[in-house]
C-alpha cells in the first residue's frame, strides 16, 4: 500500500525508494579525509548544476537530491520529459521531512567518502544506511594510486622520499608524478630529467613532492607514455560480483574530463579495433575482475571504472604491454602498446553516465539516436553554469572528441 508524503506527488512503496546524490567533489574529499569538507567553488557549482543527472540511471520512484527542483526539472527535460515523471527531485529540507516517515531504502551517491557520510548524518539519514568509518577507510585505500600500483599496474612505484622521486625521473627520462588522491589533473606533475640536468635542482617541484609526502604519505612515479587514445572499462559491484558494463571512450583537455562517445558497445569495440583486438580487451577485462572482485566484495557495492591508455611502444617502454594482432600474436607491427590501468575510480564515472544516457536515449527513441548513430556527450562551462550536452558526430584521428 502506498504512503502519501506532502512533498511527493505519488505514492511510495516500502523497500523500493533510493536516494541518489551527485557529489563530483568526491575525489577531493577523499584526499582531505575530513568529516566536514568544503569543496572549491567550481566543485560546488558542478554539483549544483548537474545534480539532476542521477535521473538517467535511477529507477521508477527514486529520489534525486538537488538544490533547486524547478532548475533540475528544466535541465532534465532536455533528455526526455519522461524522466521528470520517473523520479522525484527533492531538496535537503524536504529530505529531512521525508525521513520522519522512515521509508527510505538506501543511499546511492556518486562516490562514498567521510565528508559525504557527515553530510548525510546531519541530514538525519539513519546510521544503518551509511557505511562504517572502517569500510570508508578501506574504500579510500583501494581508491588510492598506491593500491593501484601494488595490484594492477606495472612500472609504477610508490615513493616516500624526495630523493627517490628524483632518481626515478632520471631513470625514466620523462615521468608522471601523482599524489595518491587527486581530481581532474590536480595532484599530477609531468617532469623531465632535463628539468634537473639544466638547473641541477628543481626547487618548485621538490617542494610540491615534499608537501604531497607530508600530507598524503607519498607519491607514485611512472614513465610518461606517448598517448594515442584514452579509454576506460566500466564495472559494477553487485551482490559480491564485479560485472562489466562497457567501454568508455573519452577525451581530456589539460588532464580534465571533457567528453564521451555515445554509441553502442559493439560500435565502441569497432572503433578500438584499429588499435587493439576485441580478444585482448576481453583478457584485460577478466584480469581486472580477478583483482577487483575479491578486493571489493566485502566493502563496496556500486559502480567503478578503470582508466586505460593506448600508446606508442618504444624499445624502452618495457611496462607498456604490446598490442596483439587478431590471432593474439605479439608481432608489434603497429608499434602500439596498451597500459591496462592508469588509475582506478572507485565511484561512478562519466563513462557510466554515457552508458546510461545512451541506453535511455535508445529506449526512448530520441531524435539524436534516430539521426546520428554516434554522438558526443560533453560537460561544458559557459562562464556561468555547467551543462551536460549531446552533440552529433563521432571522433576522428585528428580530433578524437572535438
Where is each model-derived feature located?
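Conserved N-proximal alpha/beta basic substrate-recognition cap immediately N-terminal to
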Residues: 44-56, 65-167
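Short, positively charged and aromatic/hydrophobic N-terminal segments
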Residues: 3, 9-16
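N-terminal-proximal low-complexity accessory segments that begin disordered
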Residues: 18-56
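ATP-dependent carboxylate/phosphate-activation module, predominantly the ATP-grasp catalytic core
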Residues: 235-292, 325-326, 330, 345-368
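Peripheral (often C-terminal) accessory segments that flank ATP-dependent C-N-forming ligase machineries
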Residues: 326-329, 363-402
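Flexible, glycine/charged-enriched surface loops at secondary-structure junctions
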Residues: 296-306, 368-375
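Glycine-rich phosphate-binding loop of ATP-grasp-fold ATP-dependent ligases
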Residues: 175-205, 232, 254-272
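Phosphate-binding site of ATP-dependent enzymes
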Residues: 173, 202-256, 305, 309-324, ...
Amino acid at each position: 500500500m502506498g504512503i502519501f508524503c506532502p512533498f511527493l506527488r505519488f505514492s511510495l512503496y516500502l523497500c523500493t525508494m533510493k536516494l541518489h546524490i551527485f557529489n563530483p567533489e568526491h575525489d577531493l574529499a577523499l584526499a582531505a579525509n575530513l568529516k566536514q569538507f568544503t569543496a572549491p567553488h567550481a566543485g560546488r557549482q558542478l554539483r549544483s548544476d548537474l545534480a539532476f543527472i542521477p535521473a538517467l540511471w535511477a529507477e521508477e520512484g527514486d529520489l534525486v537530491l538537488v538544490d533547486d527542483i524547478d532548475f533540475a526539472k528544466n535541465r532534465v527535460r532536455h533528455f526526455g520529459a519522461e524522466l521528470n515523471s520517473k523520479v522525484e527531485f527533492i531538496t535537503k529540507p524536504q529530505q529531512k521531512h521525508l525521513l520522519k516517515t522512515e521509508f527510505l531504502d538506501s543511499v546511492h551517491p556518486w562516490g562514498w567518502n567521510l565528508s559525504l557520510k557527515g553530510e548525510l548524518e546531519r541530514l538525519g539519514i539513519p546510521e544503518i544506511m551509511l557505511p562504517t568509518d572502517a569500510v570508508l577507510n578501506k574504500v579510500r585505500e583501494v581508491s588510492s594510486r598506491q593500491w593501484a600500483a601494488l595490484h594492477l599496474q606495472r612500472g609504477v612505484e610508490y615513493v616516500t622520499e624526495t630523493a627517490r622521486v628524483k632518481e626515478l625521473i632520471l631513470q625514466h627520462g620523462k615521468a608522471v608524478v601523482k599524489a595518491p588522491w587527486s581530481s581532474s589533473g590536480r595532484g599530477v606533475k609531468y617532469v623531465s630529467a632535463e628539468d634537473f640536468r639544466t638547473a641541477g635542482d628543481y626547487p618548485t617541484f621538490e617542494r610540491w613532492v615534499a608537501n604531497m609526502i607530508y600530507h598524503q604519505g607519498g607519491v607514485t612515479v611512472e614513465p610518461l607514455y606517448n598517448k594515442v587514445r584514452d579509454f576506460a572499462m566500466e564495472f559494477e559491484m553487485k551482490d559480491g560480483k564485479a560485472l562489466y558494463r562497457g567501454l568508455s571512450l573519452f577525451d581530456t583537455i589539460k588532464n580534465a574530463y571533457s567528453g564521451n562517445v555515445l554509441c553502442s558497445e559493439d560500435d565502441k569495440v569497432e572503433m578500438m579495433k584499429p588499435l587493439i583486438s576485441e580478444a585482448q580487451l576481453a583478457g584485460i577485462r577478466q584480469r581486472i575482475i580477478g583483482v577487483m572482485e575479491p578486493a571489493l566484495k566485502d566493502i563496496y557495492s556500486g559502480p567503478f571504472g578503470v582508466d586505460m591508455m593506448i600508446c606508442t611502444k618504444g624499445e624502452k617502454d618495457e611496462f607498456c604491454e604490446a598490442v596483439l594482432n587478431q590471432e593474439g600474436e605479439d608481432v608489434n607491427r603497429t608499434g602500439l602498446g596498451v597500459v591496462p590501468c592508469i588509475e582506478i575510480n572507485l565511484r561512478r564515472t562519466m563513462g557510466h553516465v554515457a552508458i546510461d544516457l545512451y541506453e535511455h536515449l535508445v529506449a526512448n527513441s530520441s531524435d539524436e539516436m534516430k539521426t546520428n548513430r554516434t554522438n558526443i556527450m560533453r560537460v561544458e562551462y559557459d562562464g556561468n553554469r555547467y551543462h551536460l550536452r549531446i552533440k552529433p558526430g563521432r571522433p576522428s584521428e585528428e580530433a578524437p572528441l572535438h
